[in-house]
Amino acid sequence: MSIKTEWLSYDVIVVGSGGAGAQAASAAADQGAKVLLVSKDPLGASDTKISEGLATVRESGSDDDMEEVLSENIKLAGGDLPIKNLTDTFSKYSKEAYDKYREHGLRPSINKEKNRPQSLPLAMGGHNRNRSVGHANHGVAFGHANWDAIIKENNIDYLEDAWFLDLIVDRKNENNKAIIV
């Protein structure tokens, strides 16, 4: 049995088509990079859909929801897993990241009085404030927004039902190779 090898050239390879992967691929393409996205699942069916359509968005429930408070909530809810730099970064950019999702079609209910996404009435997931935003189509809404972020960009190619097995680094020539099945 012989295996056919196809050599391709990309500026950026993104592994995963969920929230982080789709948005990373979109950001790289926005900067002019030729992007390959590798997904183990069909596009729109990533593990991000497991979120059941909930997103943590700072200040969605109140104006005095500070970055430090959200970061601390995430650390406490995650036990010993969270890394301070990551929880701080998430807290700082949660509104901006959520707005990026909205640019790609995510449609929350809007609090008309405050002109922002409507948070759920109760604090969820270990949070001390109500900053969880729900969506009518639950996780499918996020899957669709991820799909939109990948498909509508001109420089994003993608492989579905594929596995990223290895990255071979050539430190002398900076000619790196990825093995994808």
Q: Where does each model-flagged region fall?
A:
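N-terminal Rossmann-like FAD-binding beta1-loop-alpha1 element of flavoenzymes
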Residues: 12-37
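Conserved N-terminal/central alpha/beta ligand/cofactor-binding core
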Residues: 3-4, 27, 33-34, 39-176
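A short, basic/flexible loop-to-alpha-helix module at the beginning of a structural domain
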Residues: 1-9
